Amino acid sequence: MVKVIDIGRVVVKVLGREAGRKAVVVDIVDENYVVITGPKQLTGVRRRRVNINHIEPTDKKIDIKRGASDEEVLKAVEAAGLVEYMREKVKPKFFGITSAEVK
């Protein structure tokens, strides 16, 4: 499967303190990094640069422009009817092992 990471794509963070939370890609820095935002008041993910290996794209996409502000992203999420979807947390899996199995 080809990873499709483009502006407006909803992604799930799979590593780090925000693992399992959803965010939206707002800018592509280079072939390894993108800028994402939750926005923070919606999902708890603040705007930051992340490695593409630390996120997993979903099939959802919203219509935003490159570098959109958190307010613009929030309005686009509301317009697409994805507010509850964005608030849901996903149990992160890394290499097929859940954190409960690591003990």
From Swiss-Prot:
Keywords per UniProt: Ribonucleoprotein, Ribosomal protein
One GO CC annotation: cytosolic large ribosomal subunit
UniProt record, GO biological process: ribosomal large subunit biogenesis; translation
Keyword Ribosomal protein carried by entry: yes
GO molecular function: RNA binding; structural constituent of ribosome
Top-level division of the source organism's lineage: Archaea
NCBIfam families in the record: PRK04333.1
Family affiliation: Belongs to the eukaryotic ribosomal protein eL14 family.
Record-given protein name: Large ribosomal subunit protein eL14
Organism: Pyrobaculum islandicum (strain DSM 4184 / JCM 9189 / GEO3)
